[in-house]
Amino acid sequence: SGGQRQRLLLAATLAVHPEIIVLDEPVSAMDPDGAHSLYELLYAIHQRYGTTIIVVEHRVDYLLPYVTDMVVLKEGQLVTADTFAAAARTMYEDEELRPLVPALWQGKLGVERRFGITLGEWRTEAEAAAELQLLGFEGGNA
């Protein structure tokens, strides 16, 4: 399967003990459980060996439990490259990207779901804006 091929390629990469691993949508051929398993493995590798892992991924929800730094591109142009929180703040300042920020934070905060905790979801823009203000964002609209 595609997932097995992805794991085999990762194993071959790890055999040479690289300091940096760059992956382009490594879970595109995997189901959600396989994707989360692979990202759990990559995170464990990072924690154990200090390997820097750079991932290009359009399904950001797969990565949110592990993200420390984030690069955001818009129409091929760099918007920001910073910590997760700083990148989210920069996105919030961009009128076109602002609607993505509540979902981004909700996903990041949703890490607890891995441990059996279900977080409430924002039902209105006002709820999202209130949460963003608690997190230190300025402005009244999400």
Regions found by a protein language model. Give the residues of each.
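Conserved catalytic motifs of ABC-family nucleotide-binding domains
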Residues: 17
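Hydrophobic anchor residue at the start of the ABC signature
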Residues: 10
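Helix N-cap at the start of a conserved alpha-helix in ABC-type nucleotide-binding domains
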Residues: 32-34
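Catalytic Walker B motif of ABC-type/P-loop ATPase nucleotide-binding domains
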Residues: 21-24
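Conserved beta-strand-loop-alpha-helix hinge in the C-terminal portion
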Residues: 77-104
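A short, surface-exposed alpha-helical micro-motif characterized by mixed small hydrophobic
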Residues: 63-65
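H-loop/switch region of ABC-family ATPase nucleotide-binding domains
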Residues: 57-58
